[in-house]
Structures are given as C-alpha cells and as structure tokens.
A protein has these predicted regions:
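Mixed-charge (Asp/Glu-Lys/Arg
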Residues: 1-46, 51-149
Length: 149
C-alpha cells in the first residue's frame, strides 16, 4: 500500500525537504521499533542523520536516505532547487567509513527499510537498484550482527 503524500499541495521544493525529514523520522522510528535505541542528530549538514545503539557499548553513525524511485544513492553533499548557485563546483561525495557506519534507506512510498553497512557500498557505484538490495530489505539482523563484530 502506498502512503498518501502532499495532499495539501505544499510547493514541490519545500515538500522535498519535508519529505526528507519525514524519511529520517521514519528511519529512526523503525530502528526503535526493531529494538535499537536511536536518536536523530539535529546538526545541519552533518554527514550522518542518526546515532543507533546496537548494544555491547557500540554506537553507529547512520545516514538515512529516502527514495521513492527504483534506486538508492550513496552520495551526499548535493542539493537541488532554485536556491542553489549552479556556478559553484559540485560538493557531492560518496559516503565512506570515515563519514558513517551504515546507510538506512527508507522507501518513501511504504516505509520499507534497507540496512546497508558502509563497507558494502564501498564495492558499488554511487547508486544501486533496490531490486538488487533484497538481502538488505528489512534485515534488522544486520544491526544485531554488527554488535558482535
């Protein structure tokens, strides 16, 4: 079942930000429902969006990426919209273990989550099709297994 979106007609650029914030809150909530204490990081332009406590004294830096399409991006630093100066060089970068420990991809259409360790994305390009990420879909055991590493 697809979720209802923007029935009030918020301007598309503004709604994009609202939707991104919603995906972050959904991701944090899903971690908590899975049994992992999790908190959103409210620092503008931080490289990660949340911290999750996976047990054994381990905290992970989590980048939450929402998607309503068929793929997920593993990059940060890029923004779009009228407010962006296109004359400035791109600041887009691919996340690494220096930035984050985990990508938590949230399907914006239904809330499905993909739990992807950053080590795994290092082997891939900047994007990957959700259909090729089935092993990560709703696989919360990945967080449990990271606690024992």
């Amino acid at each position: 079942m697809a979720w209802t979106k923007n029935i009030t007609g918020i301007e598309s650029g503004v709604f994009r930000s609202v939707n991104g914030n919603s995906d972050e809150m959904i991701g944090v909530g899903r971690c908590m429902k899975a049994g992992f204490p999790c908190s959103r990081v409210d620092v503008t332009n931080a490289k990660y969006d949340a911290i999750v406590d996976i047990g054994n004294g381990k905290l992970l830096r989590v980048q939450i990426k929402g998607t309503s399409g068929a793929s997920i991006s593993f990059t940060g630093g890029g923004r779009s919209g009228q407010q962006i100066n296109r004359a400035v060089a791109s600041r887009t970068y691919k996340y690494t273990k220096d930035d984050i420990d985990l990508i938590l991809a949230v399907d914006s259409t239904n809330g499905d989550c993909y739990i992807i360790p950053v080590e795994d994305i290092s082997k891939w390009g900047n994007t990957k099709s959700l259909s090729k990420l089935k092993a990560y879909k709703e696989n919360w055991d990945i967080l449990k297994n990271l606690a024992t590493k």
